[in-house]
Amino acid sequence: MNFKAFATLTTHHTDPKRLPKDIREALPREALDKKRVYPKDFPKDARDELFARYWVGLEPLRKSGKLGAILLQYPDWFAISRANKEEIVRARELLPDDRLAVEFRNATWMSERNRSETLAFLKEHGLTYVSVDEPQGFPSSIPPIAAVTNDELAIVRFHGRNAENWKKPGLSAAERFDYSYSKKELEEWLPKIREMAEEAREVQLLMNNCYGDKAVNNAAQLAAMLG
C-alpha cells in the first residue's frame, strides 16, 4: 500500500489548521494569520517533528509488511538546485528504511541537460524515479521517460493527456485528470514497461486519470495487453 507524503514534507503549502496543535503553536505569529504556510514558515525542529510523526503513523503498516512506497511528489516550483537536492536527501534521512519514490512536477529535473544528473542522484540515494505520462507542451511538463533508479521498485503514473484542463484554473483534481487512454496510447508504453521489468524486481503501473471509471478501465486494458 503506497502513501503520498504530507504536503509540508515535500515543500507544498498547507492550511495551518491541518497541523497538530503543538506544531501549529510553534509557528511564528505572522504565519498563523496565513491561509497557507510553507516550509520556510516552520522552525526546523517543527518540520523534523512532522516527519517523525508521519513515520510513526505508518508503523503499523510497516510492521505488518503492508507498507509499499512513500511518494514524495514535489511541486512545480521545485526546480533542480543544490538546495533542493539537499531537501530530497533530508527526506531520505528522516525516512531511512522506507521505499521512497520521487515524482517531479518541474521540468528542469528531466531536461536533456539535467536528466542524467537527476537519475544518477536518485540512484545514489536509493530513490525510485516515478516515470510519468502527462500532458506535454507546458513549461512544467515532464517527458514520458521510463527510467529505473532502484532495482527493487520502478513506478509509472499515468495522469492522462487532457492538455485543455491540465493548467486551467478553478478545476478540481479529478477534472484535470479527466482522460481515457486509447489502445494506441497504452501500447506506446508496452516496450518501456517490459524493459523496466528487466531492470527492477517490481514495477507498479498506477492510473491517476481518476475521473469516473476511466482509471479502472484503462488499468484493465493495460493489464490485458501485458498478459
Question: What are these model-predicted stretches?
Answer:
Residues 2-227:
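Residues lining hydrophobic/aromatic ligand-binding pockets adjacent to catalytic sites
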